[in-house]
Amino acid sequence: NWFWSGGCIVNETASETLKKINSQVNIIPKNLDLTYENIEVVGKPNVILACTDNMESRFLLNDYALKNNIPFVYGVSVSDKGYILNVAKGRTCLRCIFKSSTEETCDTIGVLNSNTTTIASIMANETIKIILGAGYEKDLIRIDFWKNEFSKIKVSQNPKCPACLGK
């Protein structure tokens, strides 16, 4: 079932579905709380996608991707808003833009169903462009689903950003 697997772990369900689509793909689902102590489990993929539900994990993936020179696609869906940012060495990262891990979450305010599928589609498209070496989006993409507003926000790298400086 593509859309609902009640009681199942999402990453395992996604892995099974993707393997049905392409049996040649190598997917190793992991169900764990990502921390600075176990971040190496991510390995050295061609690209990292952050589909996590909290900013702390997103910052962790951001830092790991920059440290290891791995392109990183950030996407978030909460309430009726969605954001996507491609992070790579020498470009704006999450820590350049967001200063704190305090935020509204799907647990606290919910999420509009159409939001998640649209954000995931754009993230998939950006990932394909990265893998193919095509030009990919440099701006922060912001979508307000309630107002039907799609916008690109110019973002700048913070010259004092600890993640960008490798600290």
Residue ranges and their predicted role:
Residues 1-167:
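Adenine nucleotide-associated cytosolic modules
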